[in-house]
Amino acid sequence: MADPSASLGLWEACWRDLVLGIVQGLTEFLPISSTAHLKVVPVLLDWGDPGVSVTAAIQLGSIVAVIAYFRRDLAQVMQGISKAFRHGQWREPEARLGIAMAVGTLPILAVGLAIKLFWDEGYETSPLRSVPSIAVVSIVMALLLAVAERMGPRRKQLSDVSGRDGLVVGLAQVLALIPGVSRSGSTLTASLLDGWQRADAARFSFLLGIPAITIAGIVELKDALAATADAGPLPLVIGILAATVVSWLAIDWLLKFLQRHSTWLFVAYRLLFGVGLLAWWSIHGAH
């Protein structure tokens, strides 16, 4: 795998990973695709594609933030699962949420493992990671979110969750392996179409993402450290810390925002982002 940091000195690498950490934190939990922005921002700044390993490792900051933010929810889920095993109380909301999280994680684990085993290097250089592909995907996902916002009945709450909900949203999460889709965007869109209230859909999306993002970050951490070997681990540490702080702020803001507002802001942003990227690419012809 090419070393995207080979031409960067220590401070340049620190600055790059600080920016990537901020971008990661802002975009991981908003339905606008962190992968797209982590690919596009370095290209626009002439840093080159940092690669899957570096971006996945920086996502560890986001997972620290989401675990810390939802620590009480996760503790309740663990207690609910424990009670269910001891007393057979599988219909309790906390136990059902735990089951939904487990069921929803299986599809992306299976597909992600298949990619890692059989298409790892090809995925890094895939046309799916090109600027025009990301632009088109962003536009398509904006239109799907618009349909979900317009048509979703918004009746379900998190306390209504079932294993079936976990499977539906988990299958949508698999789409996030396509650069530009947005894990948060695909799961939020599926949840809205399935009748969830906005804030509860976002909350479930965040909780469902914890296992997948954690495993991806840990798996790629070794390669990420190797990719930044010339500059040492400091740049990656800075990126992870920045992602942690900004992710916490983004989670808190989005949950409060969706209690009072619709997702049309994100539909508009994704459309403009996609169209803007296509316009930029048509002028510069960059990939």
Curated annotation (Swiss-Prot):
MF terms in GO? undecaprenyl-diphosphatase activity
Tell me the disulfide pairings in this chain: none
Classification via InterPro entries: UppP
Show the Pfam families listed in the entry: BacA (PF02673)
Q: Which organism is it from?
A: Parasynechococcus marenigrum (strain WH8102)
Keyword set includes Cell cycle: no
Location in the cell reads: Cell inner membrane
The protein depicted here goes by the name: Undecaprenyl-diphosphatase
Q: What else is known?
A: Bacitracin is thought to be involved in the inhibition of peptidoglycan synthesis by sequestering undecaprenyl diphosphate, thereby reducing the pool of lipid carrier available.
Spell out the reaction equation it catalyses: di-trans,octa-cis-undecaprenyl diphosphate + H2O = di-trans,octa-cis-undecaprenyl phosphate + phosphate + H(+)
An example of a Gene Ontology BP annotation on this entry? regulation of cell shape
Q: Known EC number(s)?
A: 3.6.1.27
Which UniProt keywords are present, listed alphabetically?
Antibiotic resistance, Cell inner membrane, Cell membrane, Cell shape, Cell wall biogenesis/degradation, Hydrolase, Membrane, Peptidoglycan synthesis, Transmembrane, Transmembrane helix
Its transmembrane ranges are: 50-70, 99-119, 128-148, 206-226, 231-251, 263-283
**UniProt cross-references to HAMAP family, sorted A to Z:** Undec_diphosphatase
Its domain of life reads Bacteria
Gene (UniProt): uppP
UniProt GO cellular component terms? plasma membrane
Q: How is the protein disposed in the membrane?
A: Multi-pass membrane protein
Its annotated function is as follows:
Catalyzes the dephosphorylation of undecaprenyl diphosphate (UPP). Confers resistance to bacitracin.
For the protein in the UniProt heading, the enzyme class is hydrolase
Keyword Hydrolase assigned to the entry: answer is: yes
Family per similarity comment: Belongs to the UppP family.
